[in-house]
Amino acid sequence: CDTPAGKYEFLGYVTREDGSVPNIGRWFDPAILSEESGNYLYYGFSPSFRFPGMETLEIPGAMMVKLADDMHTIISEPVCVANGYDTAKGTDYEEHPFFEASSIRKFGEWYYFVYSSQQMHELCYGMSKTPEGPFEYKGVIVSNGDIGYEGNELATNYYGNNHGGLVEINGKHYIFWHRHTHGRAFSRQGCADKVEILADGTIPQIEMTS
């Protein structure tokens, strides 16, 4: 497709050249980064529980594979770039393990991996100098209950799962995310807030706005 508005043509399932699919990580919530060094696909779902059919699946966390230029042939084996529930203990991800919602961006010399954590209200991020990671956990960008902002320990409103990503617009950076309305997990409202990228590349947690 030549424009983001579509219409899209189905190219095929993401598989190895022989048609097989790596049996590590849950193929869920994908994100793509394409640059001169290659095409990178990030994916993953890392719950503290197992759905039927997932009992024996190895789920280290957020996974990454390289794709051929056809964008659906896997040319590298999966590697874990951010620790999930099963592997976070003893790492910087221990309090905020990867859950789902992979999002990848590059600003300046840094690659930013944004994800929804096991805490079920926040978008966290890790940083790496390479798209292949691993991404060093750096903190929370936004909580849809403002938990953690300026020391808040209690939610300021109904909160729940969060998805989103970073965008640069006219030299400024924003986090797009969603909050929950009407006190229900399925009433979700898209939101955007400006973020500040500090000299060392880190992003302080922001207060959610209306």
Regions found by a protein language model. Give the residues of each.
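Carbohydrate-active catalytic/glycan-binding domains of CAZyme proteins
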Residues: C1-S210
